[in-house]
C-alpha cells in the first residue's frame, strides 16, 4: 500500500476550489477584484499543470478575434501579476501559463493525489477536502466555454468524490469499522 504524507505543508498561496472558492495568502484571505483574473487562477489551480495560452484564450474569450484575445490575455496576466502578493506566483512563457508549484497549492490537486492513494487514511483526508461542488456559485458571464469547462469539471470531481467514498466504505467494512 502507498502511504500518504499526512503532515502536508500548505504552500503560502492556497486556492480552495471545492465548495465556495476562496484564496489565501499566508493563511489570510486574499481577493482579486476582477472576476476574469479569478477565473484564470481557478483554471490554473485546478490541477496545477501549465495551461497552453491557446486554450486559455479560447476558454476566456471564445467569441472574439484571436489577436484581440491574445492581447486580452497579456493584459490579464499583467493585471494578475500586479494584483498578486508576489509576481512569481504566476509563471508564463510564449506557449503556456502556470502557477508556481513551489508557492501555490490547491485543494483539488491535493484531493486528486489523495484519491489516488492506496490507503483509507488518504481517502478519509480526500473526503474531508470535498466541501461541496467545484467552484460552487462562481460564474463567468459571457464565456460559454468557461461554463462548459466548469460543468465538466464539476462532474469529474463529483464522480471522484463518490468513487473515493465507495473505496473508503469498502475498506472500513473490510476492517469491521462501521457503525
Regions found by a protein language model. Give the residues of each.
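Intrinsically disordered, low-complexity protein-interaction/activation regions
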Residues: 1-179
Amino acid at each position: 500500500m502507498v502511504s500518504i504524507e499526512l503532515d502536508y505543508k500548505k504552500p503560502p498561496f492556497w486556492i480552495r476550489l471545492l465548495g465556495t472558492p476562496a484564496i489565501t495568502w499566508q493563511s489570510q484571505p486574499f481577493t482579486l477584484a476582477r472576476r476574469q483574473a479569478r477565473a484564470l487562477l481557478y483554471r490554473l489551480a485546478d490541477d496545477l499543470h501549465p495551461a497552453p495560452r491557446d486554450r486559455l484564450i479560447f476558454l476566456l474569450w471564445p467569441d472574439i478575434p484571436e489577436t484581440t484575445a491574445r492581447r486580452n490575455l497579456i493584459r490579464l496576466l499583467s493585471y494578475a501579476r500586479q494584483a498578486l502578493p508576489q509576481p512569481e506566483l504566476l509563471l508564463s512563457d510564449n506557449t503556456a501559463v502556470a502557477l508556481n508549484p513551489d508557492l501555490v497549492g490547491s485543494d483539488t490537486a491535493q484531493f486528486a493525489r489523495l484519491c489516488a492513494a492506496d490507503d483509507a487514511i488518504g481517502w478519509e483526508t480526500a473526503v474531508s477536502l470535498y466541501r461541496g461542488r467545484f467552484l460552487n456559485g462562481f460564474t463567468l458571464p459571457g464565456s460559454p466555454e468557461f461554463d462548459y469547462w466548469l460543468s465538466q469539471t464539476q462532474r469529474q470531481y463529483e464522480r471522484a468524490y463518490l468513487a473515493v467514498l465507495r473505496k473508503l466504505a469498502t475498506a472500513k467494512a473490510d476492517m469491521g469499522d462501521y457503525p
